[in-house]
Amino acid sequence: MNSPKDNPNADLAYQKTILGSVSRTFALTIPLLPPTIEKVVGNTYLLCRIVDTIEDAADLSPSSKQALSKLFLDAVLEKSPVNTFVEPCLSALKNYSNQDELDLIIHTPTVLRILHTCSIKDQAAVSRCVSIMSDGMSHFHTKQTQVGLKDLQEFEQYCYVVAGVVGELLTTIFSNHSPQFAQRIRGQEGLAIAFGQALQMTNILKDSPEDKARGVSWKPANVSQTELLCIAYQKLEDALRYILLIPKQDIGIRQFCFLAFGLACMTLSKIANHKQFTHKDELKLSRHTVIAFYGFTKIASSNDALIKAFFSLSTRSLRKLSQP
């Protein structure tokens, strides 16, 4: 029997399988990318999911989360052997209920082996992203309160370290593989941050009832839901501009971004139409809606007019909130 190191196909098969287990959305969107980009983006998502799992562990103190985050980052940056992270992390998460995420942590060596088969440029971009996210989350571990983050500035910073930086990473990887996109995005890299932040704001608003139940809020204190939805709409406008900069010949990249963007638009619109909700399942898009929109992206991703029309129609309720 081959050792894991001799079987890169088995590693990639694991990456594909676990991606489907830990994220229905990204299991749908990531395979739309060209194969070389699909591998590194899928790999990055799993690394970020490990960071996220540490953050979500309600039983752990902020100092324990910070210690585990540092061990993980050291393993990613090859400063220490990966088992110096895996063993203490599994021990700390012995009461953690999500078995798929625990399995992902067990397979951290597999995920890192895949990372090291990517190009040097892509590896550098991933390491930067995971470093900023891990350090940023460690900083925010000490700010977990029921009241929420201090102000909008702190909220923006949180959204940057958990998602804006992913927008930057995607832009770097897309640019590494598409010289035309690299040329078009030059000077407008801030749109990439807004793209990531729009997706993160969607998650924060959607997950707020569950966060509240475990004594945490990632929303800024003393800022209304309406104001947050207006900010999210502005981020979506920038995200739209980002998507339209992607060359039509890079159709897989366009479709990947448009699918994630569209699901966020529809979810935020549902939030805008629900004055009160007690569980994120109330905002969940139906399977039929997701499949129908997936089919629509295949038609619309190369058509700027259709993308703009979708945005205009799907965000009417958000736009009303933004109007005086």
Q: What residues fall within each predicted segment?
A:
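Catalytic cores of Mg2+-dependent Asp-rich isoprenoid enzymes
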Residues: 1-199, 205-324
